[in-house]
Amino acid sequence: MSWQTYVDNHLLCEIEGDHLSSAAILGQDGGVWAQSSHFPQFKPEEITAIMNDFAEPGSLAPTGLYLGGTKYMVIQGEPGAIIPGKKGPGGVTIEKTNQALIIGIYDKPMTPGQCNMIVERLGDYLIDTGL
């Protein structure tokens, strides 16, 4: 199965009539493995800051999480494993696996919990398979 299939079928899946607005699977170096068509163009330093927060949980809290130039307020997640962010009626969830970052971006009416569930389901599967 291609990485694009994981994005299209597992991250952009429908949950209770809603779905993520965009999603991606990135290498921990910021290389794009697969992404949805509307995933924001991010800067390398944004991925570096995200990876730093996984290494030192809470480092993004004072400045916020930036992805594609959009600032998200970091909310409490699972230190070292999940970084959730909020912006207005939407937000982002990022899970770190052994080799990748799974990123889901959502808008209302999807809830943060639904986004977390989608991202964590794929992320946990990849962790279980060693990726």
Swiss-Prot record:
<keyword id="KW-0009">Actin-binding</keyword>
<comment type="similarity">
    <text>Belongs to the profilin family.</text>
</comment>
<protein>
    <recommendedName>
        <fullName>Profilin</fullName>
    </recommendedName>
</protein>
<keyword id="KW-0206">Cytoskeleton</keyword>
<dbReference type="GO" id="GO:0003785">
    <property type="term" value="F:actin monomer binding"/>
</dbReference>
<dbReference type="Pfam" id="PF00235">
    <property type="entry name" value="Profilin"/>
</dbReference>
<keyword id="KW-0963">Cytoplasm</keyword>
<comment type="subunit">
    <text>Occurs in many kinds of cells as a complex with monomeric actin in a 1:1 ratio.</text>
</comment>
<keyword id="KW-0020">Allergen</keyword>
<comment type="function">
    <text>Binds to actin and affects the structure of the cytoskeleton. At high concentrations, profilin prevents the polymerization of actin, whereas it enhances it at low concentrations. By binding to PIP2, it inhibits the formation of IP3 and DG.</text>
</comment>
<dbReference type="InterPro" id="IPR036140">
    <property type="entry name" value="PFN_sf"/>
</dbReference>
<dbReference type="GO" id="GO:0005938">
    <property type="term" value="C:cell cortex"/>
</dbReference>
<dbReference type="InterPro" id="IPR005455">
    <property type="entry name" value="PFN_euk"/>
</dbReference>
<dbReference type="InterPro" id="IPR048278">
    <property type="entry name" value="PFN"/>
</dbReference>
<dbReference type="InterPro" id="IPR027310">
    <property type="entry name" value="Profilin_CS"/>
</dbReference>
<dbReference type="GO" id="GO:0005856">
    <property type="term" value="C:cytoskeleton"/>
</dbReference>
